[in-house]
Amino acid sequence: MATVSMRDMLKAGVHFGHQTRYWNPKMKPFIFGARNKVHIINLEKTVPMFNEALAELNKIAARKGKILFVGTKRAASEAVKDAALSCDQFFVNHRWLGGMLTNWKTVRQSIKRLKDLETQSQDGTFDKLTKKEALMRTRELDKLENSLGGIKDMGGLPDALFVIDADHEHIAIKEANNLGIPVFAIVDTNSDPDGVDFVIPGNDDAIRAVSLYLGAVAATVREGRSQDLASQAEESFVEAE
């Protein structure tokens, strides 16, 4: 199963927190000290906590669970999308729309509209419209794809959230809490760990650190899914006998 070592984390700068003046006292148990007015995260805590989170995500994936990757900061946006797609999961990498989880019924209607517009753009419907109407629908399609494209095939609520930056994505975390959906999150020294079921203390800004987290999560999810596919194959083999 995918794991991450102390050396990997040091190379990626996972241990660099935020400036000391911006700290959240609730993160004190995970802080090693400070250097040049920047908090240093205790990787002796982070390594086992992250690997525990990876093991749990592996189990969720192995039982066909849906994992929603959330990271809407510009620096993480593309990496979040790439990681989710690489393991056939789902993502929100632009703005989190309030009610995305708690008002799923309405979101489902918007997804239906998105899919209808996609069909229209491909079957020649747009070509039959006036230029103005075609432009309006193209803009609507782009807007919906931007906000819902990563969840349009999710088919229901996710079984877990993996979040880059608990502070920035606090609305998503609160919605997951309300619905009892487990939250796995990167929590930096300026963030509140409350509401996060699997806290991963670490740098949430450095792209190398973000890439490390996402790469490991995607790998463990792929492994979990392959276990599920292997067990399905075994079952069908037994039935065939």
Curated annotation (Swiss-Prot):
Sorted keywords for this record are: Ribonucleoprotein, Ribosomal protein
Gene Ontology biological-process annotations: translation
* UniProt-listed InterPro entries: Ribosomal_uS2, Ribosomal_uS2_bac/mit/plastid, Ribosomal_uS2_CS, Ribosomal_uS2_flav_dom_sf
A Pfam family annotated for this chain is: Ribosomal_S2
Q: Name one GO cellular component term.
A: cytosolic small ribosomal subunit
Q: Which Gene3D superfamilies match?
A: Glucose-6-phosphate isomerase like protein, domain 1, Helix hairpin bin
Query: What PROSITE patterns does this protein map onto?
Result: RIBOSOMAL_S2_1 (PS00962), RIBOSOMAL_S2_2 (PS00963)
Instruction: State if Cytoplasm is listed as a keyword.
Output: no
The answer, when asked if Isomerase is one of the entry's keywords, is no
In its UniProt record, a GO molecular function of this protein is: structural constituent of ribosome
Per the record, the similarity remark reads:
Belongs to the universal ribosomal protein uS2 family.
User: What name goes with this protein?
Assistant: Small ribosomal subunit protein uS2
Species per Swiss-Prot/TrEMBL record: Klebsiella pneumoniae subsp. pneumoniae (strain ATCC 700721 / MGH 78578)
